[in-house]
């Protein structure tokens, strides 16, 4: 039995959502082959860092390679479209054909079934994040053989909106949380009285960055009492242009003026490892954002939140904006000083209980680490698959 965990992205932010499962599978005595497949050097480095001695010993590491044609195409189009990410499947079909199970964090892997005909390959989706956006619950989710999810909110929406069969969904908690169990928050800006994490999403139709981001930075430059960690979604500045397909938009994140880079109370991180490993969501006192699912990681410990509705959405009562119930929603950075001034009081009098309810509906956590729960599901699915294969083989032999 060959089970592979695929990491195929420009950035490392998805690794923490499924690599802990591979590690738990290896430590739990799974008797099949466990493989981690990466598509670039950045991902390989992150996998080796988190996986330690298991990578290359109990867990085989395969580095997928693009063809020369893909490399040429990618060099021309990579500023707009992730061609290498899309074509890596075609270029490595023999590897994917050799697998029984493929565990993935994203949906482009469904190309293996839909375009390349690998219908016998069982693909398990771990998801990456526990956010509320509709794209996380689109019909593509029903194309997976099994989906692992964090809690009842996600399961219920997958069944109701994506059409996933209830038998094809398992609640396992949130494996990424296993990586920070017992860790203490870092003090990122020690001179600041309070630290705010500004975490805008890359999607132009949802993000506050394109319209209001520089005004947000300006506010903190002039208000040194509050420290600012500007750690946007790692894909906001990854390419020259941001292209979204769920609602087609193209925009440019642009440059960050030098004056913000020199601010003593401003920490800017556009995509380092810390942007993906919960360092900043643990370290901040207040969350400021728009559509990123990292809000739910921030709620691991309830704290004040502020949301910037830069597009004037009518959001109340809409499940795609459920996370905005965790704090005050403002329409402009001009409202930020007052929102920050009352954030602590509003948190205690209005939002703390709501946050705890939201966290409980989003994450089903217990004393068993989430990665071990996920590994148990994969082991069961693999055993069921092996049993069915043996029965089919015996039946074929008996009728021969």
PLM feature spans:
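Nucleotide-sugar donor-binding and catalytic loop/hinge architecture
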Residues: 1, 182-197, 221-222, 363, ...
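Active-site and donor-binding regions of nucleotide-sugar-utilizing enzymes
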Residues: 6-24, 35-181
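Short hydrophobic signal-anchor/transmembrane segments that target glycosyltransferases
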Residues: 21-24, 209-228
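Structural loop-to-beta junction motif characteristic of Rossmann-like glycosyltransferase folds
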Residues: 121, 286, 302-306
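A nucleotide-sugar donor-handling region in carbohydrate enzymes
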Residues: 143-212, 234-238, 355-356
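Catalytic binding pocket for nucleotide-activated donors in carbohydrate/polymer assembly enzymes
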Residues: 166, 293-362
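Donor nucleotide-activated moiety binding/catalytic core segment of transferases
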Residues: 245-293
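C-terminal amphipathic helix plus adjacent low-complexity
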Residues: 338, 342-400
